[in-house]
Amino acid sequence: MSSIVTGASGFIGRMLTRMLVDSGEKVVGIDRVPQPPRPGLTVLTADLLDDDGLVRAALADADAVYHLAGCPGVRDHGDGIAWRRHRDNVLAGARVLNAVPKHVPLLVASSSSVYGGARAGRPSHEADPVRPAGGYAESKVLLERLCAERLERGGRTTVLRPFTVAGEGQRPDMALSLWLAAAREGRPLRVLGSLDRTRDVTDVRQAAQAMIDLAASGAQGVVNVGTGRGQTLRALAAAVAEVLDTEVAFAVEPAPRIEPGASLADTRRLRSLIGWSPRTDLHDVVRRQAAAARPLLEVA
């Protein structure tokens, strides 16, 4: 079986690519960022919006496509961020949606941010109206609309809504990475809003496995990828302190509008499709992420 992973150099993309290759699949990894080659992996270094013949051929000939490429980052910052999000999340997504044959399973990474947070502590269900807050979530809603159009035309399409993925390989600008770096350097951990806010923290390994199982299940439409259990920021900070064997202090700031008070996945549809849902051992996830980041710190 041959699978395509776009965004193969990204956080979830690297883990997904590794797991697919380890399972014996032939994988084509597409990314603008070069990847180290390995047996079972064909690397295509390309921009999805370039008219690259190798990319077109790979997308047309795959048995399954995981479209994870995009412009990440929930918070609005930086010059030109709105255009980059539209370009990388919407326009590039449209290019992939049009290039993959209708009969090929296409799994597209959206985001739990489209929900705008859990409503009164109730888990977010796939049928809930979307309430995007901020440009990132809005770009993902536009991408989801394109996916719905492909599905209506008979194209096999699954929209993935991952919840707060953590573990080895997490981007350095994400919350847990920032907290680990701050704790190592003796700086206070920056907290937006309150330590009592909750997040559905999902282990990157289990998120990737859920995506693989969804591809095999023939699932179509929108599917949450989360645990269905909220973890407080206080519990996450305690895990950081325990893993690094240090005391931590906090710098609490008002939360911006786009920062939800809670995120929580309704996992009933996921479990009905693949028979299980992720379970996160918070200490283990933090330990693995901290261990993976240490060699990078030593090189720097």
What are these regions (language model features)?
Residues 94-135:
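Conserved Rossmann-fold NAD(P)-dependent oxidoreductase catalytic core, especially the SDR/UDP-sugar
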Residues 3-22:
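N-terminal Rossmann NAD(P)H-binding glycine-rich loop of SDR-like oxidoreductase domains
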Residues 6, 30, 65-69, 106-112, ...:
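SDR active-site strand-loop-helix element
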Residues 48-88:
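NAD(P)H-binding glycine-rich loop region in Rossmannoid oxidoreductase-like domains
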Residues 25-36:
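Conserved glycine-rich Rossmann-like NAD(P)H-binding loop of the short-chain dehydrogenase/reductase
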Residues 145-199, 204-208, 239-240:
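NAD(P)-dependent short-chain dehydrogenase/reductase
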Residues 183, 187-300:
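C-terminal substrate-binding subdomain of Rossmann-fold SDR/epimerase-dehydratase oxidoreductases
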Residues 139:
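Active-site helix of classical SDR
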